């Protein structure tokens, strides 16, 4: 992996039978020549969301909340405010599955700032969420109708934990999640052991450059610091029903519920659990999550039925947000002894369905859904080019705008395709078409993330009218 991609430092761990095999690579800090060890402290970024989800499910186990409770029933620090009074309430279930209708950016004017305006400059105090969301957190879509990855939903879950328990989230996680699992070097706030911390880097033309350290305001979504040793203990617990050799944090049935499909826009795609993404590797059920912060990238994989886990923590990896998930997926397939999915040449096209799937699938919602728009731009168009269906992403990236061939992937289902993303280090991706339950129109679902694009009838018709006859 690291022969193909430049990094400053990396830690990889494979967890089996409650034990971790560890490999360190590169440097934790260039200036001091510190190596990467099992006790190097990394920022794990959005993998923090999985810990916040566990804290929420602990409250559910204790009967302090119900998953279908309106979030506002438990929030004391601020309110979730719908853009349309006709919207239903945002529930805790919605927040756990990124289907709350809350957008990716709470303050659109800050979208071009560091971390989309969710962090503070070095030395600046981190404002409480009651101040950060003092005008309320806007809900821009009917809850439950649209999947949008958002830090603000999990920041809100962290606030619910604090408001229900009367304890700061950092203290609650330490006492009820980290310490029971033996994760003694893990914290939500910056650790005191500065000499053990990895420095985040970005790779420039002249070499690695240390990134400016900024603390996240949306703590429950992205603020945790941890070590490979502690993350190994965490994965061990996730693979053994919520317990490891040090203690337990959840009942096994609760963890099973978290890994089950809780949001699944189409039964043919894996969908989302509570705080975890779902997938499949050669018929093996897998659970995963990625983390991204400036200078740091992280990835965890679990194969619960095989009691196999994998984690990777990286500093200074150029475009690691693209290649780290793909490279670790390759490693996970190898550990499971199964082949990675590939483009098939043995499945025939079905031209009779092309008129159904061809057309425009716009990216709906706020322009502040930056991550989604970085993948699909203003949306996608399915068209026939060279006698075969292609998917054009409406983006300035020339290769995506020219189009990606839609390769049939299932001999029993003509609406399932695969696209080749290997030039970006992403392997292949599965695309599923089906009729939307709500509207009856054609919808496009992605396997990589549970995002849905819906075909626009009027845009597609306008395109047909402009075409020469």
Model-derived segments and spans:
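Active-site SXXK
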Residues: 12, 18-20, 41-68, 154-162, ...
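Short, glycine/proline-biased beta-turn/loop segments that scaffold the active-site neighborhood
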Residues: 67-83, 181
């Amino acid at each position: 992996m690291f022969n193909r991609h430049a990094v400053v430092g990396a830690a990889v761990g494979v967890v089996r039978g409650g034990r971790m095999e560890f490999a360190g690579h590169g440097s934790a800090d260039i200036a001091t020549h510190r190596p990467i060890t099992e006790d190097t402290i990394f920022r794990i970024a959005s993998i923090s969301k999985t810990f916040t989800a566990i804290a929420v499910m602990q409250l559910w186990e204790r009967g302090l909340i119900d998953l279908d409770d309106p979030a506002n029933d438990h929030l004391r620090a601020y309110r979730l405010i719908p853009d349309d009074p006709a919207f239903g309430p945002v529930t805790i279930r919605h927040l756990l599955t990124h289907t709350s209708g809350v957008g990716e950016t709470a303050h659109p004017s800050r979208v071009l700032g560091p971390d989309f305006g969710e962090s503070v400059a070095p030395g600046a105090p981190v404002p409480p969420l009651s101040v950060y969301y003092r005008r309320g957190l806007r809900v821009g879509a009917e809850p439950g109708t649209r999947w949008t990855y958002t830090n603000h939903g999990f920041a809100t879950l962290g606030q619910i934990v604090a408001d229900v328990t009367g304890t700061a989230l950092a203290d609650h996680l330490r006492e009820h999640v980290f310490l029971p699992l033996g994760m003694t070097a893990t914290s939500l706030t910056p650790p005191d052991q500065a000499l053990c911390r990895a420095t985040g880097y970005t790779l420039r033309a002249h070499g690695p450059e240390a990134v400016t350290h900024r603390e996240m305001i949306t703590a429950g979504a992205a603020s945790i610091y941890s070590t490979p040793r502690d993350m190994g203990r965490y994965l061990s617990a996730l693979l053994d029903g919520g317990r490891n050799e040090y203690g337990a944090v959840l009942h096994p049935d609760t963890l099973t519920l978290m890994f089950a499909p809780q949001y699944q826009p189409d039964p043919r795609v894996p969908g989302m659990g509570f705080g975890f993404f779902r997938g499949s590797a050669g018929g093996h059920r897998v659970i995963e999550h990625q983390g991204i912060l400036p200078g740091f990238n992280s990835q965890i994989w679990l194969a619960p039925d095989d009691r196999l886990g994998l984690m990777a923590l990286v500093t200074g990896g150029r475009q690691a947000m693209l290649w780290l998930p793909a490279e670790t997926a390759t490693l996970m397939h190898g550990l499971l002894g199964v082949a990675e999915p590939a483009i098939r040449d043995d499945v025939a096209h079905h031209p009779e369905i092309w008129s159904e799937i061809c057309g425009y699938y716009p990216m709906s919602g706020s322009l502040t859904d930056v991550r989604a728009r970085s993948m699909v731009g203003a949306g996608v168009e399915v068209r026939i080019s060279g006698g075969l269906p292609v998917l054009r992403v409406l983006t300035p990236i020339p290769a995506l705008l020219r189009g990606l061939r839609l390769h049939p992937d299932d001999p029993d289902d003509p609406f399932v395709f695969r696209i080749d993303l290997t030039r970006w280090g992403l392997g292949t991706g599965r695309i599923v078409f089906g009729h939307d339950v709500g509207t009856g129109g054609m919808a496009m679902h992605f396997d990589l993330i549970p995002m849905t694009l819906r075909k626009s009838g009027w845009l597609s018709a306008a395109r047909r009218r402009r075409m020469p006859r």
